[in-house]
Amino acid sequence: VHQGDGQTFSIQAQAGQFFQNNGISFVEPWLFGTRPTALSVSLNQSLVRYSDAYGSTQKLNIFSASVGLNRLLRWPDDYFSLYTGIQYQSYDFNNYPFQFGNTTEYNGSAKNFSFNVGLSRNSAGMDPIFPTQGSNIEASVKFTPPYSLFDKKDYSTMAAIDKYKWLEFYKVKLKADVYNTVVGKLVLRTVAEMGFLNGYNKELGAPPFERFYVGGTGLFGGRFDGRELVALRGYENASSTGGTIDDITPYGGATIYNRFAAELRYPISMNQTAKIYALTFLEGGNAWNSFGSYNPFQLKRSVGAGIRVYMGAFGLIGFDFAYGFDKTINGTEPAGSRTHFLMNQSL
């Protein structure tokens, strides 16, 4: 790699009590040598392993490979960028529960070949740690080929585990972050985001993977088992299955979610070596397992305060204290007080 061209080669390894995640990636930021066009290539291997209440080992192994292009655009203005990519994933699970339609399966395998397209506009300025003006708006779609529309199989008589040998779905996400200086150094950040997952064939519906799990901050490991974690402070992190007494995510994961937040931020120190700011927030969101049960006005609400510390050697570290006003799915009382720890996460 020629020095000074900005190429990045990285090796990543993460481990916790129940997971291991290893990956390598390469980024070429000037693929065509003119307007910035970044080529990214990555390989990743994840293993989730833990024991259930009966002492049996539950295992999930995921391999993924992806290639993507991110290009800065000149139209409609210079703040826009377009991402296109392809991804291959394989899932192998043993004694690990996944919700396949109305059936829970514990052993099997599945493959996922998907296309990704994302359009974003980022005018939030040069400081990603403490923006004071502008916005970051993103829209993306992830989709697979519609295999079931061409293979002429009768999925109504097929076993649940056999329906998803090759996953088919489309997944749409929207997110808007807006920053405004209120007075002096006080900054208001407002956030709105949503996601929707579905299949092409009503006999298949949404797949058991790629679902949304809402709650807490999702700090440790959940992103490695075929799901997407969505933060909602004031509530517990989503469990591995969803649907427990502490969950706001339905059993088997959600196919629709909404989240809204408003944060007031005030800088304590903006030194180059350490940036520190305090914040207070209002937040609301929820997750649903079907469009029929979707209600955008039925939100789980919370309020809280926190602090963020950014240091180059450690990245962004944060502590939030939150109170959830609403009941969980199977709870009888408000969620109550929660303390959240964050590390290099954008909520």
Give each language-model segment a name.
Residues 265, 302-308:
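Short glycine-rich, acidic/polar surface loops and turns
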